[in-house]
Amino acid sequence: MAKEGEERKKEKKEKKERKERKRREAEELAVREKKISKKHKSKSKEEEKPEKSKKKSKKYEEVEEEEKSPSPSPSPKKSKESKKKHKRSSDESEEIVDSKPVTVPIVTIESDSDFEFDKEDIKNLLESYSKEELINLIYKTAEKGSKLISAVFESADRDSSQRNIFVRGLGWDTTHENLKAAFEVYGEITECSVVMDKDTGRAKGFGFVLFKTRKGARAALKNPEKRMYNRTVSCLPARPFNSGKPREQQQPVESVKIDLSHTGNQSEMALPGIDLGHGLDKGHQQQQNMSMYAGQNMPFYGHSQPPPGFNPMYGAMMGNPMVAGLQNYRMFGSGMMNQGPMMPPNHMGMVGQYVGDGNVNGVGAGAGAGAGFDGERAWYLR
């Protein structure tokens, strides 16, 4: 049985080998036939070419023989037809000659955009527009990929303020390396700094990150608040110190010349005939004038009363006992206010208003003329 099985296997193998041989032979025959057919086709083409050339040469020979042989006199009809043909051919040749392209000047309407402007002219033209108008013009006319937009992006990338970020909320143990590692995810960083305390050597809680491109800074600012080493950190675009809108200029303040005779506004007081050309505002000037009354030992140039609205106690509080007693100024002559030592302000102001007995240092209950006035005058004349 085993021998029969082996024989069957051998027979099957032989059959397979025969089939493969036949298939290979058939393929080889097909390849040979293709090659032979290609050769025949190439030969037939080569044979056709000389035949065509022979036909052409025969035609040329016939034409030459006709030209050499004397032609019989043509009939008048044929001569007319030949003349017409010659005329047509000459007309066609003339038309062909005239069909050459002729440059004709095209009339165009010139506009301002066709001229080439100077840089100064463009600058003057742009200065007439406001900032908002220029922004709207660029925003509407510029398209993605245009030269204008690319120039804007290039200038923004060159500007460090467009790529710099301010980070706050950092821990005291934050270092430059930690901050750089946290923000490298958004783009390449050119500079990174953490502000340190000189005394302790620890971080103050804020720092700066400068990206190489504006794209990285914008990616970092998409989410202003971030988690960094178990802390909430906030990011803001860093701006230079002098950037932004200019500070509003203060309105120019006129130099005010105030006279004591001016009673329209009792809150505005100054010494007569003195022009304060310091450019101070009215509130500051009022405070300065009141301090001049309270802190300077100046006579009032013959005026019997201080300016209206003046409280004599204000002079005592500001440290000038002389001004505190101005209610009794009419009883002295001019030039006597600056003579002799001064009494402390706590007593002088009270004596000027509330004089009731002869003791200068005491405080009385009544007002009017009496021994108190004489005591006060004696104190001034000491």
Swiss-Prot record:
Name of encoding gene: UBA1B
Annotated keywords: Nucleus, RNA-binding
Protein name, per record: UBP1-associated proteins 1B
Family annotation (SUPFAM superfamilies): RNA-binding domain, RBD
PROSITE patterns: RRM
Residue ranges occupied by any RRM domain in the UniProt entry: 163-248
Keyword Nucleus: yes
Organism per entry: Arabidopsis thaliana
GO cellular component: nucleus
